[in-house]
Amino acid sequence: MQAEAADWFSSMPFQKHVYYPLASGPEGPDVAVAAAAAGAASMACAPPSAASGPLPFFQFRPRLESVDWRRLSAIDVDKVAGAVDVLTLQENIMNITFCKLEDEKCPHCQSGVDPVLLKLIRLAQFTIEYLLHSQEFLTSQLHTLEERLRLSHCDGEQSKKLLTKQAGEIKTLKEECKRRKKMISTQQLMIEAKANYYQCHFCDKAFMNQAFLQSHIQRRHTEENSHFEYQKNAQIEKLRSEIVVLKEELQLTRSELEAAHHASAVRFSKEYEMQKTKEEDFLKLFDRWKEEEKEKLVDEMEKVKEMFMKEFKELTSKNSALEYQLSEIQKSNMQIKSNIGTLKDAHEFKEDRSPYPQDFHNVMQLLDSQESKWTARVQAIHQEHKKEKGRLLSHIEKLRTSMIDDLNASNVFYKKRIEELGQRLQEQNELIITQRQQIKDFTCNPLNSISEPKGNPLAWQAFESQPAAPAVPMNAPALHTLETKSSLPMVHEQAFSSHILEPIEELSEEEKGRENEQKLNNNKMHLRKALKSNSSLTKGLRTMVEQNLMEKLETLGINADIRGISSDQLHRVLKSVESERHKQEREIPNFHQIREFLEHQVSCKIEEKALLSSDQCSVSQMDTLSTGEVPKMIQLPSKNRQLIRQKAVSTDRTSVPKIKKNVMEDPFPRKSSTITTPPFSSEEEQEDDDLIRAYASPGPLPVPPPQNKGSFGKNTVKSDADGTEGSEIEDTDDSPKPAGVAVKTPTEKVEKMFPHRKNVNKPVGGTNVPEMFIKKEELQELKCADVEDEDWDISSLEEEISLGKKSGKEQKEPPPAKNEPHFAHVLNAWGAFNPKGPKGEGLQENESSTLKSSLVTVTDWSDTSDV
């Protein structure tokens, strides 16, 4: 009970600490107690807001009743507590709650009630009154809930009735749906079958087969059936006639359609062909337009690139000018700061101060703003330039790759072409070799019939052992002329005996090997001539060589458009080339042998060229000495004259076959150098005539003027073709000029003549003239070795022209004569061709430039000869 009472008190509906009691109902205390119990039970599960209607204002009632002491004394409290007698409490609750105890006094002492006890009793009365009010409220709530429950029960009953009714309706609807579904399925079957059901013409019925329909008609439509049959037959006949007409029309329309279809097919084919041709023309135009646009784009890009480069150069120049101006301004500022005068007082300094400081500040701000603006603009231009440069570089790289592909394709074509031409050249070379062999057989026959020269061998030895006397200058005095007159005939006899009286020797093994090498050189020269005759092939080879060189340089990290590289990069490239060379040495077993063989070939060619040039120099020197050393008339005895004539004729006859052999073996004579005079000029013919008259007639001989250095340069640099042609012409014209032919001996004889004289009669302080000319001709031969390769090397030719002009200018003045004794004349004879001070320096410079130009010339010569 205590727990129930606690729950009951805890669930009382307080509203803002104010309770609103309801009016007491007419029920008695029993009903109230039952209602209180029911209310307590319902409040345990219902929320306080479940009460409906406004809550009345609660207020405690005044205590006006007196205490019924007799009834109270009659109640046994222990019994009520033990039996839980609620009814007794209900009977006395009103008297206890609303009695007034303030006026009550003790019957014995007549004293009033203790105030604390009175307070306790009053609180208990208030509590009971509140509990009564709560009981009334709960009872009213219970009544409302019961009413609502009753209404809900009524609604439930009605809902049940409605559910049963709807269930019946649903059942009937399901049956109707099943029936209609079956009907729809049958109709669908009939619609799908089409001819499987038969519709009655007189009613709406349909049947699954014809028998059912006939039975239906006979049973239901007997009279109508006969009339229908008649109509049906008439309709059938009408339909048949219409069908025949329609078939004819169909046949006619079919033929017309076929003709129209054929015509349309022909028209479509023609239109398709026209459209195809138009598309092809359009594609060609489009490709052409695309190429034109590409070319325009490339041109525009080049123009834009040039414009940007110009702007960049202008900006750089402006920037450098501004930097220079800034540096000048800074220097001037430093000078102004350093040139401060004497110190002044404060008032003087204020007086001297500028009256416009604000303007200066504004100008400085304006300059700063302009500088920032220009720097920003320059940075923007730099960024745009970098972007444009990157785009152009990418486009250039694409174009370069495409060009490399095209060049590779053209290289393959040219390689095949070169192989074909090489085969043809090989066949022609074989034919030429056979013809040369036949010519050699024809020319070798006269060598076997040559007889030994007539004369006394002791006289040859005497002539050869005596040294040659030096030349006498033109302006020497008469005394020296008389002293040397007796020795002049002997000198000239010795000079001509050295040319005429040497015996003819057979060809040695070295000369035979040299002839074989000359044949190979002639074959290679024929190849070079064939390449020169076909200029397009030479240009193609040149482009191929340039392309290969560019590719090799690019593989080594050197671009083609670079003008120079640093030393570090050069060392790196040389290291890479050296490593590649070592790699090739490891891959090729006979690498060193091949290299030595090639070096030997090149050195042999250079030596051969040098020997040929030295031979020409020796012949020219002997011509010069023979014409320049005869100062007076010479009276030769008749015996000596006859001996000279005999030896000249025999020597000329013996030397002709070898010269002719050389001429016939060289079908492609070399071009003469640009600094030489044409062969057989009028001056040389005049000199030869003078020599012939001097040595053939006993009369007086006029002294010719001394040859200057310019004429010597002309005579010393003659080609092989000049020498061979001169030999042939002089051989044909043998009888009128025997002595003149004897002067031009073979070059091998002159070369053999100089070594045994080189250290015999050379005076102290003199210069060996033949050795000097041999060295000089070696240098000149390096220059003129590849004159025929003009397409490959133009720079060396230009240097030769300039060198020839310079040497011609320097060598125009004749050597000055001196009135000295005979020993001085000997020194002058040996040092006649020794250049002096400034001329020697010019010669050295010419030699260095010649050597520099000959480096390229020799390499080109070796490359073209190996092709």
From Swiss-Prot:
Q: What is the effect of changing R63Q?
A: In SPGF47; decreased protein abundance; loss of sperm flagellum assembly
Composition bias (Low complexity) maps to 848-859
Per the record, the major location class is: cytoplasm
In this chain, the stretch annotated as Required for interaction with DAZ1 covers 154-278
Q: Name one GO biological process term.
A: cilium assembly
The reply on keyword Zinc-finger is yes
Compositional bias annotation for Basic and acidic residues:
807-823
**Location of the region described as Mediates interaction with GLI3 and localization to the cilium basal body in the Swiss-Prot/TrEMBL record:** 12-367
Report the GO terms under cellular component.
centriolar satellite; centriole; centrosome; ciliary basal body; ciliary base; ciliary transition fiber; cytoplasm; cytosol
Keyword Nucleus present in the record's keywords: the answer is: yes
| Annotated keywords | Cell projection, Cilium, Cilium biogenesis/degradation, Coiled coil, Cytoplasm, Cytoskeleton, Developmental protein, Differentiation, Disease variant, Metal-binding, Nucleus, Phosphoprotein, Spermatogenesis, Zinc, Zinc-finger
List the biased-composition ranges (Acidic residues): 722-733
Q: Give the record's family classification.
A: Belongs to the DZIP C2H2-type zinc-finger protein family.
Q: Which PANTHER family match?
A: CILIUM ASSEMBLY PROTEIN DZIP1, ZINC FINGER PROTEIN DZIP1
What is the protein name for this chain? Cilium assembly protein DZIP1
The gene name on file is DZIP1
